[in-house]
């Protein structure tokens, strides 16, 4: 099982196939995705890779994290995420994973945080039909109606759908097709929509319900760490 990647959602556009058919795609950008740490079975009880993406200012990074970045000889990162992997898919600390980690035609699962919409009513939040427009209904046309019976059941059940905060939820969209990959610019074009606002962080993984294509690199598309990479300053 390979590692996933951290990317930023740039927005949506469309590309054309050789047959002239247009395909709506979401553009995802990789921002210096590097391996920051390894988790091993002997030391941690499980196997995983901690990846970092984006460049953070040193003054905004906690001292403990600055020391961690310094040991890994990587610049401070804005986003840190762990991906579970098999022992044979571990990648050396400091290595950069490039966009050709995923190949065109491959299916991926993408996880993002939905756009926040604040406090909304049940009609918008849960697609309720609302109450009647007339015949005794006043003011409460868009309410959710009764929440529980009188004597029976005499209570409101847990998880009753009501008005409340809508959005800012972690959502995974499965089986999205990779349309194009641009290694030089670090772009991955995925067919369809992905949850989240422009500039938001998303996680890309190999689709769990699809077979990994033969051309996919294993353990990943790796760019070796540069010897002169500036590390975080301790202190």
Swiss-Prot record:
Q: Name one GO biological process term.
A: translation
Give positions of region: Disordered: 138-157
Q: Enumerate the UniProt keywords alphabetically.
A: Methylation, Ribonucleoprotein, Ribosomal protein, RNA-binding, rRNA-binding
A GO CC term assigned to this protein in UniProt? cytosolic large ribosomal subunit
Modified how: Methylated by PrmB.
* Record flagged with keyword Ribosomal protein: yes
Modified positions (N5-methylglutamine) in chain numbering: 151
Any one Gene Ontology molecular-function term assigned to this protein's record: structural constituent of ribosome
Q: Does the keyword rRNA-binding apply?
A: yes
Q: Which residues form the signal peptide?
A: none
Q: What does this protein do?
A: One of the primary rRNA binding proteins, it binds directly near the 3'-end of the 23S rRNA, where it nucleates assembly of the 50S subunit.
Concerning HAMAP family, the annotation shows:
Ribosomal_uL3_B
Quote the subunit structure annotation: Part of the 50S ribosomal subunit. Forms a cluster with proteins L14 and L19.
| Family the entry assigns | Belongs to the universal ribosomal protein uL3 family.
Protein's name according to its UniProt entry: Large ribosomal subunit protein uL3
Q: Which gene encodes it?
A: rplC
């Amino acid at each position: 099982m390979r590692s996933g990647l951290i990317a930023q959602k740039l927005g949506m556009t469309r590309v054309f196939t050789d047959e002239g058919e247009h395909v709506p795609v979401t553009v995802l950008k990789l921002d210096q995705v590097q391996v920051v740490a390894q988790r091993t079975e002997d030391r941690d009880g499980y196997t995983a890779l901690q990846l970092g993406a984006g460049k953070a200012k040193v003054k905004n990074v906690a001292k403990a994290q600055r020391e961690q970045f310094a040991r890994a000889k990587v610049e401070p990162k804005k986003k840190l995420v762990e991906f579970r992997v098999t022992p044979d898919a571990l990648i050396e600390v400091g290595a950069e994973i490039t966009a050709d980690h995923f190949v065109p035609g491959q299916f991926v699962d993408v996880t993002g945080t939905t756009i926040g919409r604040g406090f909304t009513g049940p009609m918008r939040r849960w697609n309720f039909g609302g109450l009647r427009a007339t015949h005794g209904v006043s003011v409460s046309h868009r309410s959710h109606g009764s929440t529980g019976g009188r004597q029976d059941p005499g209570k409101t059940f847990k998880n009753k759908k009501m008005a409340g905060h809508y959005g800012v939820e972690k959502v995974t969209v499965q089986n999205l097709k990779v349309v194009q990959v641009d290694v030089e610019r670090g772009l991955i074009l995925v067919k369809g929509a992905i949850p989240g606002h422009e500039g938001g962080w998303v996680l890309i993984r190999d689709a769990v319900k699809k077979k990994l294509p033969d051309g996919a690199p294993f353990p990943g598309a790796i760019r070796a760490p540069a010897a002169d990479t500036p590390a975080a300053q301790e202190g």
